[in-house]
Amino acid sequence: MESQRNLILIGLLFVSFLLWQQWESDKAPKPAPTTVAQTEHFVPEAGQTGDIPQVSEQANANAARKLITVSSDVLKLTLDTQGGDIVSAELLAHKLEEGKDQSFVLLTSQPDRLYVAQSGLVGRDGPDSQAQGRPTYEAAQTSYQLADGQDQVVVPMTWTDSKGVVFTKEFVLKRGDYAIGVDYKIDNKSAEPVQVQFYGQLKQTVTTPKDQEGHAMVASAYRGGAFSSEESRYKKYTFDEMKDADLNKTTKGGWVAMLQHYFVSAWAPNADDTNSFYSRVIPGKDQAIIGYKAPLVDVAAGQQAEVTSKLWVGPKLQDQMAKVANHLDLTVDYGWLWFIAQPLHWLLTVFQGFVHNWGVAIIMLTLLVRGIMFPLTKAQYTSMAKMRMLQPKLAALKERFSDDRQKMSQGMMELYKKEKVNPLGGCLPILVQMPIFIALYWALMESVELRHAPFALWITDLSVKDPFFVLPILMGASMWYLQKMSPTTITDPMQQKVMQFMPIIFTFMFLWFPAGLTLYWLVSNVISITQQTIIYRQLEKKGLHTRT
Protein backbone atom coordinates (compact mmCIF):
# COMPACT_ATOMS: atom_id res chain seq x y z
CA MET A 1 0.00 0.00 0.00
CA GLU A 2 1.21 3.51 -0.86
CA SER A 3 0.44 6.70 1.03
CA GLN A 4 -0.86 8.18 -2.23
CA ARG A 5 -3.40 5.42 -2.51
CA ASN A 6 -4.43 6.13 1.05
CA LEU A 7 -4.94 9.77 0.14
CA ILE A 8 -7.17 8.64 -2.72
CA LEU A 9 -9.08 6.45 -0.28
CA ILE A 10 -9.53 9.35 2.15
CA GLY A 11 -10.73 11.58 -0.65
CA LEU A 12 -13.17 9.06 -2.06
CA LEU A 13 -14.56 8.20 1.38
CA PHE A 14 -14.99 11.84 2.34
CA VAL A 15 -16.54 12.88 -0.98
CA SER A 16 -18.84 9.86 -0.82
CA PHE A 17 -19.87 10.90 2.68
CA LEU A 18 -20.73 14.42 1.52
CA LEU A 19 -22.62 13.17 -1.54
CA TRP A 20 -24.61 10.74 0.59
CA GLN A 21 -25.52 13.49 3.07
CA GLN A 22 -26.62 15.79 0.24
CA TRP A 23 -28.63 13.00 -1.40
CA GLU A 24 -30.40 12.32 1.89
CA SER A 25 -31.52 15.95 2.08
CA ASP A 26 -32.39 16.32 -1.60
CA LYS A 27 -33.91 12.95 -2.56
CA ALA A 28 -37.46 14.05 -1.70
CA PRO A 29 -39.12 16.70 -3.89
CA LYS A 30 -39.53 20.04 -2.16
CA PRO A 31 -43.01 21.54 -2.03
CA ALA A 32 -43.66 24.75 -3.87
CA PRO A 33 -43.73 27.87 -1.68
CA THR A 34 -47.18 28.94 -0.58
CA THR A 35 -48.16 32.47 0.36
CA VAL A 36 -50.25 32.43 3.52
CA ALA A 37 -52.82 35.20 3.44
CA GLN A 38 -54.46 34.36 6.76
CA THR A 39 -53.30 32.37 9.75
CA GLU A 40 -55.63 29.64 10.96
CA HIS A 41 -55.26 27.80 14.22
CA PHE A 42 -55.55 24.07 14.73
CA VAL A 43 -56.21 22.74 18.20
CA PRO A 44 -56.35 19.09 19.23
CA GLU A 45 -59.52 17.67 20.69
CA ALA A 46 -59.45 15.86 23.98
CA GLY A 47 -59.28 12.26 22.87
CA GLN A 48 -57.58 10.85 19.81
CA THR A 49 -54.46 12.67 18.69
CA GLY A 50 -55.18 12.21 15.01
CA ASP A 51 -58.34 14.33 15.16
CA ILE A 52 -57.16 17.94 15.04
CA PRO A 53 -60.07 20.20 14.06
CA GLN A 54 -59.68 23.68 12.67
CA VAL A 55 -60.77 26.75 14.62
CA SER A 56 -60.67 30.00 12.68
CA GLU A 57 -59.15 32.94 14.49
CA GLN A 58 -61.78 35.15 12.85
CA ALA A 59 -64.46 33.42 14.93
CA ASN A 60 -63.57 35.81 17.75
CA ALA A 61 -62.50 38.73 15.62
CA ASN A 62 -64.47 41.29 17.61
CA ALA A 63 -62.29 40.83 20.71
CA ALA A 64 -59.67 43.47 21.52
CA ARG A 65 -56.50 41.78 20.33
CA LYS A 66 -53.07 43.07 21.43
CA LEU A 67 -49.43 42.19 21.09
CA ILE A 68 -47.32 42.08 24.25
CA THR A 69 -43.53 42.18 24.33
CA VAL A 70 -41.51 40.57 27.11
CA SER A 71 -37.72 40.63 27.35
CA SER A 72 -35.10 38.89 29.42
CA ASP A 73 -31.35 39.21 28.99
CA VAL A 74 -31.36 36.51 26.26
CA LEU A 75 -34.89 36.51 24.81
CA LYS A 76 -37.37 39.01 23.44
CA LEU A 77 -40.82 37.51 22.88
CA THR A 78 -43.97 38.84 21.27
CA LEU A 79 -47.18 37.38 22.67
CA ASP A 80 -50.58 37.50 20.98
CA THR A 81 -53.32 38.03 23.56
CA GLN A 82 -55.68 36.04 21.34
CA GLY A 83 -54.85 32.52 22.43
CA GLY A 84 -51.66 33.59 24.18
CA ASP A 85 -49.35 32.30 21.45
CA ILE A 86 -45.68 33.25 21.03
CA VAL A 87 -45.61 34.79 17.56
CA SER A 88 -42.05 36.11 17.65
CA ALA A 89 -38.84 35.19 19.48
CA GLU A 90 -35.60 37.11 19.13
CA LEU A 91 -32.39 35.60 20.51
CA LEU A 92 -30.61 38.66 21.88
CA ALA A 93 -27.24 36.94 22.36
CA HIS A 94 -27.19 35.71 18.75
CA LYS A 95 -27.02 38.11 15.84
CA LEU A 96 -28.57 37.52 12.45
CA GLU A 97 -25.27 38.32 10.75
CA GLU A 98 -21.76 38.60 12.13
CA GLY A 99 -20.87 42.19 12.94
CA LYS A 100 -24.48 43.44 12.69
CA ASP A 101 -26.78 44.60 15.51
CA GLN A 102 -29.95 42.81 14.39
CA SER A 103 -30.78 39.83 16.60
CA PHE A 104 -31.50 36.38 15.20
CA VAL A 105 -35.26 35.76 14.97
CA LEU A 106 -36.20 32.12 15.57
CA LEU A 107 -39.99 32.41 15.83
CA THR A 108 -41.88 34.71 13.49
CA SER A 109 -45.39 35.33 12.19
CA GLN A 110 -44.19 36.32 8.70
CA PRO A 111 -46.49 34.44 6.28
CA ASP A 112 -43.72 33.13 4.00
CA ARG A 113 -41.68 31.73 6.92
CA LEU A 114 -44.25 31.20 9.66
CA TYR A 115 -42.86 29.61 12.82
CA VAL A 116 -44.83 30.04 16.05
CA ALA A 117 -45.29 28.33 19.42
CA GLN A 118 -48.92 27.77 20.34
CA SER A 119 -50.57 26.46 23.49
CA GLY A 120 -53.94 26.36 25.16
CA LEU A 121 -56.56 24.39 27.01
CA VAL A 122 -58.97 22.11 25.17
CA GLY A 123 -61.43 19.54 26.44
CA ARG A 124 -65.02 19.89 27.57
CA ASP A 125 -64.50 23.25 29.28
CA GLY A 126 -61.27 24.35 27.62
CA PRO A 127 -61.34 27.98 26.44
CA ASP A 128 -59.53 27.05 23.20
CA SER A 129 -62.27 24.64 22.10
CA GLN A 130 -65.24 26.95 22.57
CA ALA A 131 -67.58 27.73 19.67
CA GLN A 132 -66.88 31.47 19.82
CA GLY A 133 -63.22 30.92 19.07
CA ARG A 134 -60.01 31.16 21.05
CA PRO A 135 -60.03 33.44 24.09
CA THR A 136 -58.55 36.91 24.07
CA TYR A 137 -56.66 37.40 27.30
CA GLU A 138 -56.21 40.62 29.23
CA ALA A 139 -52.85 41.82 30.50
CA ALA A 140 -51.97 44.73 32.76
CA GLN A 141 -49.15 45.92 30.50
CA THR A 142 -48.11 45.72 26.87
CA SER A 143 -44.41 45.50 27.69
CA TYR A 144 -42.48 43.54 30.31
CA GLN A 145 -38.74 43.75 30.97
CA LEU A 146 -36.41 41.76 33.23
CA ALA A 147 -35.05 44.43 35.54
CA ASP A 148 -31.56 44.62 37.00
CA GLY A 149 -31.33 42.46 40.08
CA GLN A 150 -34.32 40.34 39.11
CA ASP A 151 -33.97 36.62 38.43
CA GLN A 152 -37.17 36.28 36.43
CA VAL A 153 -40.01 38.17 34.80
CA VAL A 154 -43.60 36.88 34.89
CA VAL A 155 -46.31 37.83 32.39
CA PRO A 156 -49.83 36.97 33.62
CA MET A 157 -52.79 37.11 31.24
CA THR A 158 -56.36 36.37 32.36
CA TRP A 159 -59.66 35.40 30.78
CA THR A 160 -62.99 34.58 32.44
CA ASP A 161 -65.58 32.37 30.77
CA SER A 162 -69.35 32.77 30.93
CA LYS A 163 -69.56 30.51 33.99
CA GLY A 164 -67.14 32.61 35.99
CA VAL A 165 -64.14 30.29 35.68
CA VAL A 166 -60.94 32.38 35.70
CA PHE A 167 -58.09 31.16 33.48
CA THR A 168 -54.68 32.76 34.04
CA LYS A 169 -51.95 32.02 31.51
CA GLU A 170 -48.44 32.87 32.71
CA PHE A 171 -45.16 33.12 30.86
CA VAL A 172 -42.04 32.92 33.04
CA LEU A 173 -38.65 34.00 31.66
CA LYS A 174 -35.55 33.50 33.80
CA ARG A 175 -32.22 35.27 33.56
CA GLY A 176 -29.81 33.58 31.16
CA ASP A 177 -32.32 30.84 30.35
CA TYR A 178 -33.94 29.89 27.04
CA ALA A 179 -36.48 27.65 28.79
CA ILE A 180 -39.81 29.45 29.12
CA GLY A 181 -42.35 28.44 31.70
CA VAL A 182 -45.86 28.28 30.19
CA ASP A 183 -48.33 27.73 33.02
CA TYR A 184 -52.09 27.80 33.49
CA LYS A 185 -53.85 28.60 36.75
CA ILE A 186 -57.52 27.63 36.84
CA ASP A 187 -59.79 29.14 39.47
CA ASN A 188 -63.17 27.43 39.24
CA LYS A 189 -65.57 29.95 40.78
CA SER A 190 -68.53 28.28 39.12
CA ALA A 191 -70.93 25.81 40.69
CA GLU A 192 -69.95 23.00 38.30
CA PRO A 193 -66.78 20.92 37.83
CA VAL A 194 -64.41 21.91 35.02
CA GLN A 195 -62.42 19.56 32.79
CA VAL A 196 -59.57 20.81 30.59
CA GLN A 197 -56.52 19.45 28.79
CA PHE A 198 -53.31 21.36 28.03
CA TYR A 199 -51.73 21.24 24.59
CA GLY A 200 -48.54 22.77 23.24
CA GLN A 201 -47.56 22.75 19.60
CA LEU A 202 -45.16 24.25 17.07
CA LYS A 203 -46.33 25.37 13.65
CA GLN A 204 -43.87 26.06 10.86
CA THR A 205 -43.75 26.70 7.13
CA VAL A 206 -42.50 23.55 5.44
CA THR A 207 -40.52 25.14 2.60
CA THR A 208 -37.00 26.03 3.72
CA PRO A 209 -36.36 29.80 3.63
CA LYS A 210 -33.68 30.84 1.17
CA ASP A 211 -31.36 32.10 3.90
CA GLN A 212 -31.38 28.66 5.59
CA GLU A 213 -30.45 26.65 2.50
CA GLY A 214 -26.98 25.14 2.69
CA HIS A 215 -24.31 25.11 0.02
CA ALA A 216 -24.23 22.13 -2.34
CA MET A 217 -20.65 21.29 -1.29
CA VAL A 218 -21.54 21.13 2.40
CA ALA A 219 -23.83 18.49 3.90
CA SER A 220 -27.10 20.14 4.87
CA ALA A 221 -28.24 20.26 8.49
CA TYR A 222 -31.57 18.67 9.33
CA ARG A 223 -34.69 20.85 9.37
CA GLY A 224 -37.96 19.31 10.53
CA GLY A 225 -39.73 17.71 13.46
CA ALA A 226 -38.45 15.41 16.19
CA PHE A 227 -39.66 13.81 19.39
CA SER A 228 -38.47 11.76 22.34
CA SER A 229 -40.39 8.89 23.88
CA GLU A 230 -39.86 5.89 26.12
CA GLU A 231 -39.05 3.76 23.05
CA SER A 232 -36.86 6.30 21.22
CA ARG A 233 -34.61 8.74 23.02
CA TYR A 234 -34.39 10.86 19.88
CA LYS A 235 -36.42 10.34 16.72
CA LYS A 236 -36.66 12.62 13.72
CA TYR A 237 -40.09 13.04 12.17
CA THR A 238 -39.62 14.74 8.84
CA PHE A 239 -42.11 16.94 7.05
CA ASP A 240 -42.51 14.20 4.44
CA GLU A 241 -43.35 11.69 7.19
CA MET A 242 -45.94 14.13 8.53
CA LYS A 243 -47.50 14.25 5.06
CA ASP A 244 -47.61 10.45 4.86
CA ALA A 245 -49.00 9.83 8.34
CA ASP A 246 -49.88 11.90 11.38
CA LEU A 247 -47.75 11.24 14.44
CA ASN A 248 -49.85 9.47 17.06
CA LYS A 249 -47.88 8.30 20.07
CA THR A 250 -48.56 8.07 23.79
CA THR A 251 -45.61 8.09 26.15
CA LYS A 252 -44.51 9.06 29.61
CA GLY A 253 -42.59 12.33 29.64
CA GLY A 254 -40.77 13.00 26.38
CA TRP A 255 -40.72 16.12 24.23
CA VAL A 256 -41.62 17.37 20.74
CA ALA A 257 -39.53 19.79 18.71
CA MET A 258 -38.83 21.61 15.47
CA LEU A 259 -35.16 21.56 14.51
CA GLN A 260 -32.91 23.58 12.26
CA HIS A 261 -29.19 24.31 12.04
CA TYR A 262 -27.90 25.56 15.42
CA PHE A 263 -31.37 26.29 16.88
CA VAL A 264 -34.38 24.39 18.22
CA SER A 265 -37.78 25.00 19.74
CA ALA A 266 -39.24 22.24 21.89
CA TRP A 267 -42.20 21.61 24.15
CA ALA A 268 -41.17 19.64 27.24
CA PRO A 269 -44.15 18.34 29.28
CA ASN A 270 -43.90 17.05 32.82
CA ALA A 271 -41.69 13.98 32.93
CA ASP A 272 -44.12 12.07 35.16
CA ASP A 273 -47.20 12.63 32.98
CA THR A 274 -48.46 10.34 30.24
CA ASN A 275 -48.62 12.59 27.18
CA SER A 276 -49.95 12.22 23.64
CA PHE A 277 -47.81 13.37 20.71
CA TYR A 278 -49.36 14.38 17.39
CA SER A 279 -48.50 16.03 14.09
CA ARG A 280 -50.50 17.47 11.25
CA VAL A 281 -49.89 19.03 7.83
CA ILE A 282 -52.49 21.76 7.31
CA PRO A 283 -54.52 20.97 4.16
CA GLY A 284 -53.94 23.45 1.35
CA LYS A 285 -51.14 25.21 3.19
CA ASP A 286 -47.38 24.85 3.28
CA GLN A 287 -47.43 24.43 7.07
CA ALA A 288 -46.84 21.58 9.49
CA ILE A 289 -47.60 21.13 13.18
CA ILE A 290 -46.04 18.93 15.83
CA GLY A 291 -47.28 19.01 19.41
CA TYR A 292 -48.41 17.21 22.52
CA LYS A 293 -51.40 16.93 24.84
CA ALA A 294 -51.11 16.51 28.60
CA PRO A 295 -53.50 14.39 30.71
CA LEU A 296 -57.01 15.65 31.45
CA VAL A 297 -57.35 17.88 34.50
CA ASP A 298 -60.55 17.97 36.58
CA VAL A 299 -61.21 20.99 38.78
CA ALA A 300 -64.09 20.71 41.23
CA ALA A 301 -66.41 23.62 41.88
CA GLY A 302 -64.77 26.19 44.12
CA GLN A 303 -61.33 24.61 43.68
CA GLN A 304 -58.12 25.67 41.93
CA ALA A 305 -55.61 23.82 39.79
CA GLU A 306 -52.36 24.52 37.96
CA VAL A 307 -50.94 23.08 34.73
CA THR A 308 -47.25 23.62 33.93
CA SER A 309 -45.04 23.11 30.91
CA LYS A 310 -41.65 24.15 29.56
CA LEU A 311 -40.87 25.58 26.14
CA TRP A 312 -37.27 25.79 24.92
CA VAL A 313 -36.69 28.48 22.30
CA GLY A 314 -33.04 29.02 21.56
CA PRO A 315 -29.66 27.67 20.49
CA LYS A 316 -28.67 24.03 20.84
CA LEU A 317 -26.86 24.29 24.17
CA GLN A 318 -26.40 20.70 25.30
CA ASP A 319 -25.79 21.26 29.01
CA GLN A 320 -28.79 23.55 29.46
CA MET A 321 -31.16 21.48 27.33
CA ALA A 322 -30.31 18.32 29.25
CA LYS A 323 -31.64 20.01 32.40
CA VAL A 324 -34.94 20.94 30.72
CA ALA A 325 -35.89 17.44 29.53
CA ASN A 326 -34.28 14.04 29.26
CA HIS A 327 -32.47 13.57 25.93
CA LEU A 328 -33.32 17.07 24.65
CA ASP A 329 -29.57 17.57 24.24
CA LEU A 330 -29.65 14.87 21.53
CA THR A 331 -31.15 17.46 19.18
CA VAL A 332 -27.50 18.37 18.65
CA ASP A 333 -27.41 15.66 16.03
CA TYR A 334 -23.97 14.13 15.48
CA GLY A 335 -25.32 11.27 13.39
CA TRP A 336 -24.38 7.64 13.89
CA LEU A 337 -20.92 8.60 15.18
CA TRP A 338 -22.34 10.55 18.11
CA PHE A 339 -20.39 8.43 20.61
CA ILE A 340 -17.18 9.86 19.11
CA ALA A 341 -18.43 13.37 18.37
CA GLN A 342 -19.76 14.05 21.89
CA PRO A 343 -16.39 13.54 23.63
CA LEU A 344 -14.71 15.62 20.92
CA HIS A 345 -17.16 18.47 21.51
CA TRP A 346 -16.60 18.19 25.25
CA LEU A 347 -12.83 18.43 24.79
CA LEU A 348 -13.28 21.37 22.44
CA THR A 349 -15.34 23.16 25.10
CA VAL A 350 -12.74 22.42 27.79
CA PHE A 351 -9.93 23.82 25.63
CA GLN A 352 -11.97 26.92 24.82
CA GLY A 353 -12.52 27.47 28.53
CA PHE A 354 -8.75 27.80 28.96
CA VAL A 355 -7.80 29.82 25.86
CA HIS A 356 -11.09 31.69 25.22
CA ASN A 357 -10.69 31.27 21.46
CA TRP A 358 -12.52 28.59 19.51
CA GLY A 359 -9.94 28.61 16.72
CA VAL A 360 -7.10 27.94 19.14
CA ALA A 361 -9.28 25.28 20.79
CA ILE A 362 -9.65 23.55 17.41
CA ILE A 363 -5.87 23.60 16.98
CA MET A 364 -5.39 22.12 20.46
CA LEU A 365 -7.99 19.43 19.78
CA THR A 366 -6.29 18.57 16.49
CA LEU A 367 -2.92 18.26 18.23
CA LEU A 368 -4.45 15.96 20.83
CA VAL A 369 -6.29 13.75 18.32
CA ARG A 370 -3.31 13.42 15.99
CA GLY A 371 -1.03 12.79 18.96
CA ILE A 372 -3.24 9.95 20.17
CA MET A 373 -3.32 8.49 16.66
CA PHE A 374 0.46 8.80 16.16
CA PRO A 375 1.13 5.11 16.97
CA LEU A 376 -1.34 4.16 14.23
CA THR A 377 0.27 6.62 11.85
CA LYS A 378 3.72 5.24 12.61
CA ALA A 379 2.50 1.68 12.11
CA GLN A 380 0.94 2.73 8.82
CA TYR A 381 4.12 4.25 7.38
CA THR A 382 6.28 1.43 8.72
CA SER A 383 4.02 -1.11 7.02
CA MET A 384 4.11 0.85 3.77
CA ALA A 385 7.91 1.07 3.94
CA LYS A 386 8.17 -2.69 4.39
CA MET A 387 5.81 -3.20 1.49
CA ARG A 388 8.02 -1.03 -0.70
CA MET A 389 11.04 -3.12 0.27
CA LEU A 390 9.14 -6.23 -0.82
CA GLN A 391 8.21 -4.84 -4.23
CA PRO A 392 11.09 -6.58 -6.12
CA LYS A 393 10.24 -9.94 -4.53
CA LEU A 394 6.52 -9.43 -5.20
CA ALA A 395 7.28 -8.55 -8.81
CA ALA A 396 9.33 -11.73 -9.14
CA LEU A 397 6.46 -13.80 -7.74
CA LYS A 398 3.99 -12.24 -10.16
CA GLU A 399 6.30 -12.97 -13.08
CA ARG A 400 7.02 -16.52 -11.91
CA PHE A 401 3.37 -17.46 -11.36
CA SER A 402 1.74 -15.23 -13.95
CA ASP A 403 -0.32 -18.15 -15.24
CA ASP A 404 -1.35 -19.50 -11.83
CA ARG A 405 -3.08 -16.94 -9.63
CA GLN A 406 -3.63 -19.42 -6.80
CA LYS A 407 0.07 -20.23 -6.45
CA MET A 408 0.92 -16.55 -6.80
CA SER A 409 -1.44 -15.69 -3.92
CA GLN A 410 -0.02 -18.49 -1.78
CA GLY A 411 3.51 -17.30 -2.49
CA MET A 412 2.64 -13.72 -1.58
CA MET A 413 1.04 -14.77 1.72
CA GLU A 414 4.10 -16.88 2.59
CA LEU A 415 6.34 -13.92 1.79
CA TYR A 416 4.26 -11.60 3.98
CA LYS A 417 4.43 -14.11 6.83
CA LYS A 418 8.17 -14.60 6.46
CA GLU A 419 8.91 -10.88 6.38
CA LYS A 420 6.31 -10.14 9.12
CA VAL A 421 4.41 -7.69 6.97
CA ASN A 422 0.67 -7.07 7.11
CA PRO A 423 -0.53 -6.16 3.60
CA LEU A 424 -3.42 -4.22 5.15
CA GLY A 425 -1.21 -2.44 7.66
CA GLY A 426 -1.14 0.74 5.60
CA CYS A 427 -4.88 0.78 5.04
CA LEU A 428 -6.38 -0.10 8.42
CA PRO A 429 -5.15 3.06 10.21
CA ILE A 430 -6.92 5.15 7.56
CA LEU A 431 -10.16 3.28 8.22
CA VAL A 432 -9.77 4.10 11.92
CA GLN A 433 -9.02 7.77 11.28
CA MET A 434 -11.93 8.41 8.91
CA PRO A 435 -14.71 7.89 11.52
CA ILE A 436 -12.86 10.27 13.83
CA PHE A 437 -12.65 12.90 11.10
CA ILE A 438 -16.32 12.52 10.15
CA ALA A 439 -17.31 12.73 13.84
CA LEU A 440 -15.21 15.87 14.23
CA TYR A 441 -16.81 17.25 11.06
CA TRP A 442 -20.25 16.98 12.69
CA ALA A 443 -18.96 18.22 16.04
CA LEU A 444 -17.79 21.40 14.33
CA MET A 445 -20.83 21.69 12.04
CA GLU A 446 -23.36 21.27 14.87
CA SER A 447 -21.66 23.43 17.50
CA VAL A 448 -23.62 26.66 17.84
CA GLU A 449 -20.71 27.95 19.92
CA LEU A 450 -18.72 28.32 16.69
CA ARG A 451 -21.41 30.48 15.09
CA HIS A 452 -19.94 33.98 14.68
CA ALA A 453 -16.95 32.90 16.80
CA PRO A 454 -13.77 34.74 15.70
CA PHE A 455 -10.33 33.17 15.38
CA ALA A 456 -7.72 35.71 14.31
CA LEU A 457 -7.05 38.37 11.69
CA TRP A 458 -9.58 38.03 8.85
CA ILE A 459 -11.30 34.93 10.29
CA THR A 460 -14.18 36.53 12.21
CA ASP A 461 -16.62 33.61 11.96
CA LEU A 462 -15.48 29.99 12.18
CA SER A 463 -18.89 28.66 11.11
CA VAL A 464 -18.73 30.10 7.57
CA LYS A 465 -16.22 29.94 4.74
CA ASP A 466 -12.97 31.87 4.77
CA PRO A 467 -13.94 35.15 3.03
CA PHE A 468 -10.56 35.43 1.29
CA PHE A 469 -10.02 31.66 0.77
CA VAL A 470 -6.61 31.80 2.44
CA LEU A 471 -7.14 28.74 4.64
CA PRO A 472 -8.37 26.50 1.76
CA ILE A 473 -5.40 27.52 -0.38
CA LEU A 474 -2.96 26.85 2.46
CA MET A 475 -4.71 23.55 3.08
CA GLY A 476 -4.33 22.59 -0.58
CA ALA A 477 -0.67 23.61 -0.58
CA SER A 478 0.01 21.55 2.54
CA MET A 479 -1.75 18.58 0.96
CA TRP A 480 0.36 18.95 -2.19
CA TYR A 481 3.58 19.13 -0.14
CA LEU A 482 2.54 16.11 1.91
CA GLN A 483 1.92 14.24 -1.32
CA LYS A 484 5.36 15.18 -2.65
CA MET A 485 7.01 13.95 0.54
CA SER A 486 5.54 10.49 0.16
CA PRO A 487 7.51 8.01 -1.95
CA THR A 488 5.54 6.33 -4.69
CA THR A 489 5.76 3.35 -6.98
CA ILE A 490 2.44 4.03 -8.70
CA THR A 491 2.78 3.31 -12.40
CA ASP A 492 -0.88 3.32 -13.40
CA PRO A 493 -1.49 6.52 -15.43
CA MET A 494 -5.04 6.92 -14.16
CA GLN A 495 -3.96 6.76 -10.50
CA GLN A 496 -1.16 9.21 -11.23
CA LYS A 497 -3.65 11.68 -12.72
CA VAL A 498 -5.98 11.29 -9.75
CA MET A 499 -3.10 11.95 -7.36
CA GLN A 500 -2.03 15.06 -9.25
CA PHE A 501 -5.49 16.58 -9.08
CA MET A 502 -6.37 15.50 -5.53
CA PRO A 503 -5.00 18.67 -3.83
CA ILE A 504 -6.81 20.82 -6.40
CA ILE A 505 -10.08 18.94 -5.90
CA PHE A 506 -9.85 19.26 -2.12
CA THR A 507 -8.94 22.94 -2.33
CA PHE A 508 -12.01 23.58 -4.48
CA MET A 509 -14.24 21.65 -2.07
CA PHE A 510 -12.94 23.46 0.98
CA LEU A 511 -13.54 26.90 -0.52
CA TRP A 512 -17.11 26.64 0.82
CA PHE A 513 -16.40 24.70 3.98
CA PRO A 514 -16.65 26.38 7.41
CA ALA A 515 -13.37 28.02 8.35
CA GLY A 516 -13.25 25.96 11.55
CA LEU A 517 -13.26 22.69 9.61
CA THR A 518 -10.71 23.98 7.10
CA LEU A 519 -8.51 25.08 10.00
CA TYR A 520 -8.68 21.57 11.42
CA TRP A 521 -7.66 19.97 8.11
CA LEU A 522 -4.83 22.47 7.57
CA VAL A 523 -3.40 21.91 11.05
CA SER A 524 -3.83 18.16 10.60
CA ASN A 525 -1.81 18.31 7.37
CA VAL A 526 0.96 20.31 9.05
CA ILE A 527 1.07 17.74 11.85
CA SER A 528 1.16 14.95 9.26
CA ILE A 529 4.14 16.60 7.57
CA THR A 530 5.93 16.83 10.91
CA GLN A 531 5.09 13.27 11.93
CA GLN A 532 6.01 11.90 8.52
CA THR A 533 9.39 13.63 8.67
CA ILE A 534 10.10 12.10 12.10
CA ILE A 535 8.95 8.63 11.02
CA TYR A 536 10.98 8.66 7.80
CA ARG A 537 14.15 9.59 9.71
CA GLN A 538 13.58 6.61 12.01
CA LEU A 539 12.95 4.35 9.02
CA GLU A 540 16.15 5.56 7.34
CA LYS A 541 18.15 4.37 10.33
CA LYS A 542 16.56 0.93 9.91
CA GLY A 543 17.24 0.89 6.18
CA LEU A 544 13.54 0.91 5.33
CA HIS A 545 13.47 4.30 3.64
CA THR A 546 15.65 6.38 1.36
CA ARG A 547 15.13 10.01 0.48
CA THR A 548 14.34 10.78 -3.14
From Swiss-Prot:
GO terms for molecular function: membrane insertase activity. GO terms for cellular component: plasma membrane. One of its GO terms (biological process) is protein transport. Keywords: Cell inner membrane, Cell membrane, Chaperone, Membrane, Protein transport, Transmembrane, Transmembrane helix, Transport. The chain crosses the membrane at residues 6-26, 349-369, 424-444, 455-475, 503-523. Required for the insertion and/or proper folding and/or complex formation of integral membrane proteins into the membrane. Involved in integration of membrane proteins that insert both dependently and independently of the Sec translocase complex, as well as at least some lipoproteins. Aids folding of multispanning membrane proteins. InterPro entries: Membr_insert_YidC, Membr_insert_YidC_N, YidC/ALB3/OXA1/COX18, YidC/Oxa/ALB_C, YidC_ALB_C, YidC_periplasmic_sf. It is a multi-pass membrane protein. HAMAP family: YidC_type1. Belongs to the OXA1/ALB3/YidC family. Type 1 subfamily. The gene is yidC. The keyword Cell inner membrane applies. Interacts with the Sec translocase complex via SecD. Specifically interacts with transmembrane segments of nascent integral membrane proteins during membrane integration. This is Membrane protein insertase YidC. PANTHER family: CYTOCHROME C OXIDASE ASSEMBLY PROTEIN COX18, MITOCHONDRIAL, OXA1. It comes from the Bacteria. It is found in: Cell inner membrane.
